[in-house]
Amino acid sequence: MKKLPVCDISYIQVRFLPIYLHQIIEKVNTKNQIIMKPEHLTVDTFKEKVFNYEASKDWKFEGDKPAIIDFYADWCGPCKIVAPILEELQEEYGDKLNIYKVDTEDQRELGAVFGIQSIPSLLFIPQEGQPQMAMGALPKETFKQAISEVLNVN
């Protein structure tokens, strides 16, 4: 059995640690507060956290707080305008709401389920009631208005 130097083992541990932490938090500010960023969803995490469309055709939100889902693509110019706004909103509202992102190029099934034909498309999901879809690069004030009026989050 070949012995590995301790530094090689720690390299392996450190190498994979940021990948895991990236899924939970993105950065820490100067006051050592955790700053959350929008979470990227796959088909499986979507079914778990938002709506299991295979189990039921009737809308049943699986989340524990209101959410916004950004259906986007990396090559989309307007999507690149919306991305930093959503990051600011996630930081501003913290754990009062969840902001998720769905890459329509990687998660084509989710785009098809919601009939996404233009991006960005944004799904506003209140804790109770039906979700509402908006399309296009919305300004921050419009997001804040929808968060207040549709999601009932202040």
Label each PLM-derived region with a short phrase:
Residues L17, L21-Q23, Q33:
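Short hydrophobic targeting helices and cationic amphipathic motifs
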Residues V28-D44:
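N-proximal helix/coil linker or "cap" segments that precede and/or mark the start of modular domains
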Residues H40, F71, A83-Q90, G94-E109:
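Thiol-based oxidoreductase modules, predominantly thioredoxin-like and allied folds used
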Residues L41-A67:
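A short beta-strand-turn-helix
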Residues D64-A67, F71-W75, S118:
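Short pre-active-site segment immediately N-terminal to redox-active cysteine/selenocysteine motifs
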Residues S118, L123-N154:
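Non-catalytic, surface beta->alpha helical segment in thiol-disulfide oxidoreductase systems
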